[in-house]
Design a protein with these regions (language model features):
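Final/C-terminal transmembrane alpha-helix of multipass membrane proteins
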Residues: 12, 186-206
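Membrane-interface helix caps and helix-loop-helix hairpins in membrane proteins
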Residues: 87-98, 113-118, 140-147, 208-209
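Histidine-/acidic- and/or cysteine-rich, low-complexity loops and terminal segments associated
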Residues: 1-52, 203-210
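Hydrophobic cores of alpha-helical transmembrane segments in multi-pass inner/ER membrane proteins
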Residues: 53-61, 104-113, 159-172, 195-197
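Generic transmembrane alpha-helix signature in multi-pass membrane proteins
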Residues: 44, 54-64, 112, 123-131, ...
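A small-residue-rich subset of transmembrane alpha-helices
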Residues: 61-98, 147-175, 187
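Residue-level signature of the transmembrane alpha-helical core
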Residues: 40, 44, 78-82, 99, ...
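Divalent metal-coordination and catalytic microenvironments
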Residues: 24, 50, 106, 132-134, ...
Length: 210
């Protein structure tokens, strides 16, 4: 088995242990953020401790680099993510949100693996829908918070996700610049890892693993 494929399967194995939908949205140990600082730290931490969220935003950065049209996928994802958080805060209901989070993450990975022609509008729509369900899931830990920690939480989410996506964008461009063949293998391997992380999260949400 080729080394990059081993990496992809190693990430998938990690996902089975780390992508716990219940724990991935409680940066403050299950406690509601009460201050600006707590809200900010919670927002900064959630996309990192939730492996499915982390993988999805990396995927947004990779696809942004591949389509060559700037940060459209990232902007679509982050904007819709804020809307998703606010939907949860408003007590709206998105059925099977955790399952949708996993499936949407897997779809992003599959899109990277296939690398068929990316249309900006279809990609933006995909990431808007993905961001909505991811934001809804992330909003679980902030429901009931006052405006100050809520605003700080949203700011933290925007900052950390923008940084993660920018890093993935830069890494993809750097890898691609080293040669078409190497870039293709590396990018597809990353896509496979993202797809497997999403699949593992979806399986856990559906009660098929864990």
């Amino acid at each position: 088995m080729r080394y990059p494929i081993r990496i992809a399967f190693a990430v998938a194995a990690l996902a089975l242990f780390a992508a716990d939908p219940a724990s991935a949205h409680h940066m403050m140990g299950g406690k509601l953020p009460q201050t600006f600082t707590q809200g900010l730290l919670s927002g900064l931490g959630h996309p990192v401790i939730g492996l499915d969220h982390f993988a999805a935003i990396i995927g947004a950065g990779i696809i942004a680099a591949l389509i060559g049209r700037g940060f459209a996928p990232v902007l679509a994802f982050t904007t819709a993510m804020i809307a998703g958080v606010m939907l949860h805060v408003a007590r709206a209901d998105i059925p099977a949100a955790e399952l949708l989070v996993g499936l949407s993450t897997a779809a992003i990975g599959l899109l990277i693996v296939l690398r068929s022609g990316f249309g900006v509008l279809p990609v933006a729509i995909l990431f808007a829908l993905t961001g909505l369900v991811h934001g809804y899931a992330l909003g679980e830990s902030i429901v009931g918070a006052e405006n100050t920690p809520l605003g700080a939480y949203l700011a933290g989410l925007l900052v950390i996700q923008s940084l993660i996506a920018a890093g993935a964008f830069a890494a993809t461009r750097f890898v691609a610049a080293r040669g078409v063949s190497f870039g293709s293998v590396a990018v597809r391997t990353a896509g496979a890892a993202i797809m497997l992380v999403g699949g593992a999260a979806a399986a856990m949400a559906a009660g098929l693993a864990g």
